[in-house]
A protein has these predicted regions:
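Bacterial N-terminal signal peptides that target proteins for export
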Residues: 1-8
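C-terminal motif of bacterial Sec signal peptides marking the signal peptidase cleavage site
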Residues: 17-18
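Core dinuclear metal-dependent hydrolase active-site scaffold
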Residues: 21-84, 145-229, 292-309
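Active-site environment of divalent metal-dependent phosphoester hydrolases
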Residues: 45, 66-68, 93-99, 121-124, ...
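Extracytoplasmic/secreted envelope proteins and their assembly/folding machinery
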Residues: 48, 70-74, 98-102, 134-141, ...
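Active-site metal-binding motif and surrounding structural segment of the metallo-beta-lactamase
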Residues: 54-59, 67-122, 223-240, 253-258
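Active-site HxH/HxHxD metal-binding segment of metal-dependent hydrolases
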Residues: 96-146, 150-151, 270
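Internal alpha/beta domain cores that form substrate/cofactor-binding pockets in large enzymes
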Residues: 230-252, 257-295
């Protein structure tokens, strides 16, 4: 291994890619801000992403809850001075992606609507005792009903939110695809493969949210006709093995990636393939446990990345 590659490998392994220079806003006016909230301070994994739109609306993608830091998501959201959310998107029903929704509601944060994708019984039953708990999912939906919070399941290709800036730039959230765990192009899947794939666009600048997209569906999408191109990628499955294959990353073609992962997991062998891919492709990599809150600032033609450390 050359000295250059060795240095680059070490930098990406700790989430400090030497290619961290990214485009700026270029004076493009209003911005959309996506903050990957740091909710993995110990060893458990979770996802929680806050989007602030130019018109003032706020969206949360996932609200994960961890066994070793159960209050992390609520604390992170409250630290952003959030009292109301116009939309919450739950990518899929694993507790590390939706468990803190209860906490947000009980803390008095107003939630206007929730986008969900409940897996079929056959998919959930494969994970009894360790993965998706449909009884808890039903209890969560009842909690939404009890608090008069509407929820819905979008369709593939549906635009679930749109606004236009003063400069005439369209900002939107689009559902690229979602499957229920049975009616999919690869048949019966696990619950990770029911992850709602969502694209945030601000003009021509794009960010792709992938939940815990796994290897089988990821391989299918890599050869599909879906438009997966994005400037910034939320790496699926906390950047660990079992996530989408390298061919999926090729299709996305991201210029920067955000990884919601604890430090030990990212440094482990479980993340080696993913780490090495971004090293070899010289893609700036931002890991939440190492960089704290990481914010992607999107403009009509560009983006920049900011982090706490």
């Amino acid at each position: 291994m050359s000295l250059h590659r060795l240095i680059l490998s070490l930098l990406v392994a700790v989430g400090l890619s030497s290619c961290a220079i990214v485009p700026g806003d270029g004076g493009q006016g209003e911005t959309t801000r996506w903050t990957m909230l740091m909710v993995s301070p110990k060893d458990d994994v979770a996802d929680c992403h806050l989007i602030r739109l130019p018109d003032g609306r706020k969206v949360l993608i996932d609200a994960g809850k961890l066994g070793d830091s159960p209050g992390a998501a609520l604390a992170a959201v409250q630290a952003q001075n959030i009292t109301a959310l116009d939309l919450v998107i739950l990518s899929h029903f694993h507790i590390d992606h939706y468990g803190a929704l209860w906490d947000l509601i009980e803390a008095g944060i107003t939630i206007k609507r929730v986008a969900i994708n409940v897996p079929v019984q056959a998919a959930a039953d494969q994970e009894k005792g360790w993965g998706c708990n449909l009884d808890h999912v039903r209890a969560t939906l009842k909690k939404l009903d009890d608090h008069h919070i509407p929820y819905f399941t979008p369709k593939t290709g549906e635009r679930i939110l749109e606004t236009t800036t003063a400069q005439g730039t369209v900002v939107a959230l689009d559902v690229i695809c979602l499957y229920d765990g049975l009616n999919s192009p690869i048949g019966l899947t696990d619950v990770n493969e029911t992850s709602m794939i969502v694209r945030l666009s601000h003009g021509s600048t794009r960010a792709l949210f992938t939940g815990d997209l796994g290897g089988r569906l990821g391989a299918y999408l890599a050869t599909s006709n879906f438009d997966l191109k994005a400037d910034i990628l939320k790496v699926p499955h906390h950047g660990s093995e079992g996530c989408a294959p390298n061919e999926f990353f090729d299709r996305v073609g991201a210029k920067a990636v955000l990884v919601p992962a604890p430090k030990n997991l990212w440094a482990s062998g479980r993340s080696m393939r993913i780490r090495n891919y971004f090293i070899e492709h010289h893609i700036p990599t931002y890991v939440s446990a190492l960089r704290g809150n990481v914010t992607a600032v999107l403009t009509a033609t560009d983006f920049r990345i900011e982090s706490e450390r």
